[in-house]
Each structure stands twice: as C-alpha cells, then as structure tokens.
Amino acid sequence: MTFRFLCWLTGLLLCTAAYAIPQRVISLAPHATEMAYAAGMGEQLIAVSAWSDYPPEAKKLEQVASWQGINLERILALKPDLILAWREGNPQRPLEQLANFSIPIVYLDAKTLDDIPASLRQLATYSRHPEQAERAATDFQQQIGELQHADEKHKAAHTAPLRVFIQFGTQPLFTSSKATLQSQIVSLCGAENIFSDSTVPWPQVSREQVLRRQPQAIIIGGASDKIANTQAFWQPQLTVPVITVNEDWFSRSGPRLLLAAQQICSQLAELKLAPSSAK
C-alpha cells in the first residue's frame, strides 16, 4: 500500500510540476524574445513584439506589440499564461490591465551585465528546458569573465584607457552614461566613456561638448559602411578611428550583448596597439 501511495504521489507531483510550466508565452520586446529562446522557451512562445527577428524562427510568430503600443485585445484572445515584458519599453497601463486578468508578467529589465545571466536563470523556472537556460547563463558569465581578465592584464601593463565616445545618431546627437549596459561594455574592454559622468542614462549632447572631451575613438552601431559618413560628420575638428558594432547586439539587453562586447573589445585592443592611439 505504501509503495503504491508513493508511486501515486510521485506521479501527481510530476504532473503538477509539468502543469506549472507555462505553455502559452508572449514576449513584448525583441530582447525578451531572444532571452526566451536562449532559455529554451522557443516552443512555448505564441506571439512576440515587432522587430523580434532573432532567432529567425521568431519572425514566424504573430506580432502583438510595437513602438505604437500593445494590442491588448489580441493578447487576451490568445489566452497567454505568461507574459515577458520590459518596463522601459512597454506602456504601463496595458500591462496593469493584463495583470488585472491574473496573467503572470515577468519583467526583463537588465541594468548590468550580471543581470543577463540572472534573467536567464529566472526564466529557467518557466522553461521546458531549464538546463538550456543554465548553460546559456554559465556561458555568458564565463566569456564575460575572460574579457574582464584580459582588461585586468592591460591595466597591469599600465596601459592608459582610451577615451571613447559612444555615438547614437547625429541630429540630434545622443550618447550613453555609465548607467547603461553599453557604457559597461566599454569599461569592460578597458576604455573610458567620455560621458560616463552624465546624470541621465541617455544624454543629448552637442558637437562642441564632444570635441571638448577629446575622444580618441568613436563607437557607432551599424555596418562598416557607416564609418565614412561618421568621419565626415566630425572632420576637420576630429579625426579619430570609428568602431562599428552590430546594432542589434549592442542595443538589446539580451544574450547577444556578449557578441557586442567581444567585437568592441577586439577592435579597441587593436587601437591600443596602434601608435596613433597613444595621443
């Protein structure tokens, strides 16, 4: 009798655990979509936001949110049992309305590089494949650690940090402060963000402000074909190397920030070895 009871109880617990895993997940931001796939939740996703284009299979899913807002009616019709949201990018009122319908909401709001693996481990509790989430988190931590170790070696060699301007747009001209993931990547690579002291995360700056701070390199998002236009924008007052980084990697607070960090660190390391970088 005891053996049968234990078998029945074990089966019940397994069924309950399986039932607790959400089966109909909606992502309301591109980086949240990437996080979900990295955490092994791809087969649980039923809808995503606009610009959710990675991995490629995400483009096949219905889109229920964009920069214009959230399609609340459609989301409710899809009957999700979990929503992945972003406080800074999603309007709060429809999220509050969704919460009123007792739909669980997980916010993915990474502020630091350490938050990325932490978020992956958080998603592991909702994933059919939690081991995949753990692998992704561990891999991210290990490779970020390798970049950090390389930076420490540069510091030990008394290599002065390059002064870097992180550029977004031209008219208006924006940059990022130390409160952003983008600036943290620059620091990880052993460089100095010239606007790290800004009191707002995404300050609008003038051409004159940038020139006064004398950057030794500029980082922009996009392909290498943007380099010539960026250099032309700053000449003749400023003639420094322009580094490009994949825009999606650099702008989304997801696992591919690691790729952005590797790309930037590699290019900055080359600049440090160049004689012109020692100005």
Curated annotation (Swiss-Prot):
GO molecular function: cobalamin binding
Keyword Signal listed: yes
Domain of life of the source: Bacteria
PROSITE patterns reported in the protein's UniProt record: FE_B12_PBP
Cystine residue pairs: C189-C265
InterPro entries reported for this sequence: ABC_transptr_periplasmic_BD, ABC_transptr_vit_B12-bd, Vit_B12_bind_prot, Vitamin_B12-ABC_binding
Protein's name in the database: Vitamin B12-binding protein
Any Gene Ontology biological process: cobalamin transport
Chief location: periplasm
Gene: btuF
Protein family according to the UniProt entry: Belongs to the BtuF family.
